[in-house]
């Protein structure tokens, strides 16, 4: 049996797209007969990330060496550029073990929005981390093209999926007539563009994050409902008239295809991530700089064509893409 070792700083109980991707792909790999070991922060002593208490990071990460040697994997994938990822990278290079990596987000843009650290600094760190990998997986064509322009090498496309048993359309979908946002409530998600947008329809926000309390006070007319999962989350998608995605820094956005699977059209900006998924007039609308205009057009999009556009995104395909990218240890 082939054994895959995944080293990741993002894992349950964190709630984000990276965790959804890695936990779901791990499950699919095991269903396909692979043995999968996952080294994650829960196996170490951790501390909450400053300004982000929802995320815990490992601090005794030097124990990683023992866990890698105990695993004896046939393939190694390093998922996140955190303490575990950096330590795993060092171990692999020191022992001449080829590995794959993944760029899940626009991390330099996130850091710039939150801490005002220059893009060149964080892009340089990312290139240092990923260009030593045999292959680096990226979510979309547009993001791949941006990364290649910035000097990243050996990039391989890796899509995303949704759980069709949970996310599916309702013939009466959109009946509640509200605008929906699902995701982290944080400045780097550009969520305030949605919160301050003028609309006759009420707004609902699903999720939590470092900016939640301040936005609850600033926008009392918005319904902040907290984290939702599974069928309860899917009901929010199905009942919404439109799913609004204001982010400028996402590389894909699993929430986008979850919304499509529920038949709910998308409104957002014409940037990497949304522009790789949204087809104008078919499953939503994008605008260069006016979110309200995108919402107005998206509200007229047919919910059936929206749902049909989601069918190419399956976790089985995502797992197959992951398998095809793996590089043998020996």
Predicted regions and their residues:
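Donor nucleotide-sugar binding/catalytic pocket of nucleotide-sugar-dependent glycosyltransferases
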Residues: 124-169
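Acidic anion/phosphate-binding donor-loop and adjacent secondary structure
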Residues: 162-177, 213-214
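Conserved donor-binding/catalytic core segment of Leloir-type glycosyltransferases
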Residues: 171-206
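Aromatic "clamp/platform" in nucleotide-sugar-dependent glycosyltransferases that forms part
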Residues: 248
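A charged, aromatic-enriched C-terminal amphipathic alpha-helix characteristic of glycosyltransferases
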Residues: 289, 300-328
